[in-house]
Amino acid sequence: MRVPFNDKVWAGRSDDGEAGDTRRVFNQVTPFGSAVRVQHDAPVIVGFSSDEGVRRNQGRIGAAHAPMELRRVLAGLPAKTAMVALADAGDVVCDDGDLEAAQAELADVVSEVLAGGGRPLVLGGGHEVAWGTYSGLRLHQQREAENEATLLISRKLLIINFDAHFDLRQKRPANSGTPFDQIALDCAERGVPFNYACFGISDLSNTASLFAHAERLGVHYVFDVDMQETQLPQRLNELQKLLDAADDVYLTIDLDVLPAATAPGVSAPAALGVPLSVIEAMVLRVRASGKLRVADIAEYNPTLDQDRRTARVAARLAYRLL
């Protein structure tokens, strides 16, 4: 089910009377519709209100409430002077257990945003959001291309996932742990490379079977212990090489990649995790590449959060992607 733009969630304090630019993000938000074209590469928020994939994956539900809560926190951040406007395309809601239909609807919305000149930033929801986001990018490519095969083969898509988990489970029906296996199968069917890089992998959160599957698929991965602050220069160089070899980038951030003290509001908190400063620096590098086409932020669970700490972290990362 699609829920339209809600301007009431975009609200915050007013500093009228103070000198200088006192605007906040909520002052920059406008509604997005399929008939609307935005400034080229302008960010467009899309909500994916779903935790059905988390439920199927035996996780702790609550992430369906995340999109609205993240908007509330994002609304109060300082306006970005370089950003003319921020559009909001509303939410796709999965409230009937039909995850597959919700993912297909999300794909339609993502495709609409791309067709309108925008750059979708999808706020999940569980990490099942990834299949919907990716499908929307592929759908847009299909609709735009006169020759789909030529377009898909000639343009190299890099998928970057900041995550403690591979999310390469092969069990069906699909859930929050299967999206990148679904993507790998889709790439194989299309005859295009599966270029998947996963940063922040925990050796204690993935079975030997998952590591073996990742090896078979040629996944580029880095352990969480190798993504601490002293190793940031090395990781940035590694990331830059991946970016240089790509034409388009899909970035997905699972908040459980962060330490539990930083992001307590997730279904599976990390015992070690990757420092926020490292994730943020790498996100900024991706953003600066000029190749980012779509992005999403997944697994925020407001019902498990403490003092909105995780919400503030997620909003900070979203802000860097605007």
UniProtKB/Swiss-Prot annotation:
Record-linked InterPro entries: HutG (IPR005923), Ureohydrolase (IPR006035), Ureohydrolase_dom_sf (IPR023696), Ureohydrolase_Mn_BS (IPR020855)
Record's keyword terms, sorted: Histidine metabolism, Hydrolase, Manganese, Metal-binding
Protein name as catalogued: Formimidoylglutamase
Keyword Manganese appears in the UniProt entry: yes
Cited CDD domains: Formimidoylglutamase (cd09988)
Record's keyword annotation contains Manganese: yes
Cofactor field: Mn(2+)
